[in-house]
Regions:
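Conserved, well-folded catalytic cores of nucleic-acid-processing
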Residues: 14, 18, 36, 51-54, ...
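Extended interfacial segments that mediate partner engagement and assembly in macromolecular machines
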Residues: 26, 75-143
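S-adenosyl-L-methionine-dependent methyltransferase catalytic core, i.e., the SAM/SAH-binding region
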Residues: 8-16, 27, 63-64, 76, ...
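Cys/His-rich Zn2+-binding cysteine-cluster or related metal-binding knuckle/ribbon modules and their
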Residues: 2-8, 17, 27-92
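Long C-terminal interaction/binding lobes of large macromolecular proteins
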Residues: 101, 129-198
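Catalytic cores of large soluble enzymes that bind and process phosphate-bearing ligands
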Residues: 3, 36, 40, 116-120, ...
């Protein structure tokens, strides 16, 4: 590669780090950035910088927030007897779009995956267990219906059941091997309504 395209190659490499983005997609995004005005490109860079410096994990549910506690955890209108456990903050947005769930959430920030060297100790499991008190009556396992999602849900259910708290799993409507993030509102609604006890 000629020396003068090194910054472009670096940009392509950085975009290529995103999950699901291959070389072609990364190249397309890099050229889109190059086609932006300087003001637009700087606004994008600043938005990334602000998100990384101003957002952190909610001390209760582990979702991203600018404050100490996120809006959902702080809301007195939420049902505090139900906690929905999700893999990532993106999954909260997917479930919230259904307008059918009014409980609280807990973000694990990953799934148990021995093949990838990810164990329960690398997830926000101890934070979840610390939240389980006499107020909580049900924990919904809303992890993706993949091998890792199922393993994580079963692991958590084994930890929670002895506490006398009902543990349920999202049911039909979610195809096996898919990601919760890509499910539409109707599919998620049916899965929430048809959840089963673990």
């Amino acid at each position: 590669m000629p020396q003068n395209v090194e910054p472009l190659e670096n940009l392509i490499d950085q975009f290529g780090r995103f999950p699901g983005v291959g070389r072609k997609g990364a190249t397309r995004m890099a050229y889109e950035v190059m086609a932006m005005s300087n003001e637009q490109a700087m606004a994008l860079a600043k938005a990334i910088e602000h998100a990384k410096t101003d957002l952190h994990r909610c001390r209760v549910c582990q979702d991203y927030t600018a404050g100490e506690v996120c809006g959902i955890c702080a809301s007195p209108k939420r049902d505090r007897s139900i906690i929905c456990v999700v893999e990532s903050p993106r999954d909260i947005q997917s479930i919230e779009r259904t307008h059918e769930y009014n409980g609280l959430y807990h973000v694990l920030h990953g799934l148990i995956s021995p093949m990838d060297g990810v164990g329960a100790e690398q997830l926000c499991v101890k934070e979840l267990l610390a939240r389980l008190n006499e107020t909580v009556k049900e924990v919904i396992m809303a992890t993706s219906p993949t091998v890792e999602g199922e393993a994580t849900a079963m692991y958590l259910a084994k930890l929670i059941k002895p506490l006398g708290i009902k543990t349920t799993r999202l049911a039909y409507g979610l195809p096996v091997g898919s990601s919760l993030e890509y499910a539409d509102e109707t599919t998620l609604y049916r899965a929430m309504q048809g959840r089963g006890e673990l």
